From Swiss-Prot:
InterPro entries the record matches: P_Acid_Pase_2/haloperoxi_sf, P_Acid_Pase_2/haloperoxidase, PA_PP_rel
Official protein name in the record: Phospholipid phosphatase-related protein type 1
Any Gene Ontology biological process: nervous system development
Modified-residue entries (Phosphoserine), positions: S307
Compartmental location: Cell membrane; Cell projection, Neuron projection
Family annotation (SUPFAM superfamilies): Acid phosphatase/Vanadium-dependent haloperoxidase
Length: 325
């Protein structure tokens, strides 16, 4: 009987997942692919001063030569929250004290007449799926900002190698709008025009903050008071150091890293609070009692005082009834 009370029939959850959510996810991944791997979106050509000291830092090499390479970054920021959510959900499901509250918040879904979707499977797919969507969405926002602004990296003039003997560069305070003045490698120059906001900073803080919100909202540890702070602060510190590494290697300006942190934080907070509702179950809000309508409540209640006339009338009525009987 308890299983029947905790079961909800739904014929739309699987079609909605296949034809709506998977389509949106595929479109997001496809758009991120076009930003990353194709020349569909051309970078804005931003002008510069030939003697700008902020753009004359030494060339740090390719991204693969960085202390935090893109491959290592993407693997860590994708695997860490996924592993935390997977291990956390399985642990809570098999621990008796947390399993009861989990079942109370999340109902078993019956699709058709034979297929059951357990609360464990639904929560894992929901939380990891939203995280993956936010990861690609953050990447799209970053690439869009870099393409639109065309902000120059600190080493731009080093790889641009402008012709300083030309008429345009002879004047120290002349602003150069001509992109053809550069004589360096065109591929490296194009990458040097994509600095704002910092992709490493945005993705790292998004991943760290999403994992931190999950840990603080779902994992309950009464025996240890320092386990959760260590995990959360460790993730946030790693993201912070990733941004500092971009500045120390002259790959981004401080403003680029700060903008990346703000962007990643905004996406993580929006998804964590407004989409997955602080990682609570779908039945969590339904169990709260509805507030009483204030229109039906009197502004002030006074005690009722019985009138002497009413008392005398009641006594006479009872006496008359006695005489009749």
């Amino acid at each position: 009987m308890a299983v029947e009370n905790n079961t909800q029939r739904s014929y739309s959850i699987i079609p909605c997942f296949i034809f709506v959510e998977l389509v949106i996810m595929a479109g997001t991944v496809l758009l991120a692919y076009y930003f990353e791997c194709t020349d569909t979106f051309q970078v804005h050509i931003q002008g510069f001063f030939c003697q700008d000291g902020d753009l004359m830092k030494p060339y740090p090499g390719t991204e693969e030569e960085s202390f935090i390479s893109p491959l290592v970054l993407y693997c860590v920021l994708a695997a860490t929250p996924t592993a935390i959510i997977f291990i956390g959900e399985i642990s809570m499901y098999f621990i008796k004290s947390t399993r009861e509250s989990l079942i109370a918040e999340e109902k078993m879904i019956l699709t058709g007449d034979c297929c059951y979707l357990s609360p464990l499977l639904r929560r894992i797919v929901r939380f990891i799926g939203v995280f993956a969507f936010g990861l690609f969405a953050t990447d799209i926002f970053v690439n869009a900002g870099q393409v639109v602004t065309g902000h120059l990296t600190p080493y731009f003039l080093t790889v641009c190698q402008p012709n300083y003997t030309s008429t345009d560069c002879r004047a120290h305070h002349q602003f150069i709008n001509n992109g053809n003045i550069c004589t360096g490698d065109l591929e490296v120059i194009e990458k040097a025009r994509r600095s704002f906001p910092s992709k490493h900073a945005a993705l790292s803080i998004y991943s760290a903050l999403y994992a931190t919100m999950y840990i603080t909202s779902t994992i309950k540890t009464k025996s240890s008071r320092l386990a959760k702070p260590v995990l959360c602060l460790g993730d946030l510190c790693t993201a912070f150091l990733t941004g500092l590494n971009r500045v120390s290697e002259y790959r981004n300006h401080c403003s680029d890293v700060i903008a990346g942190f703000i962007l990643g934080t905004a996406v993580a907070l929006f998804l964590g609070m407004c989409v997955v509702h602080n990682f609570k179950g779908t039945q969590g809000s339904a169990s709260k009692p509805k507030p009483e309508d204030p229109r039906g409540v009197p502004l002030m209640a006074f005690p009722r005082i019985e009138s002497p006339l009413e008392t005398l009338s009641a006594q006479n009525h009872s006496a008359s009834m006695t005489e009749v009987t």
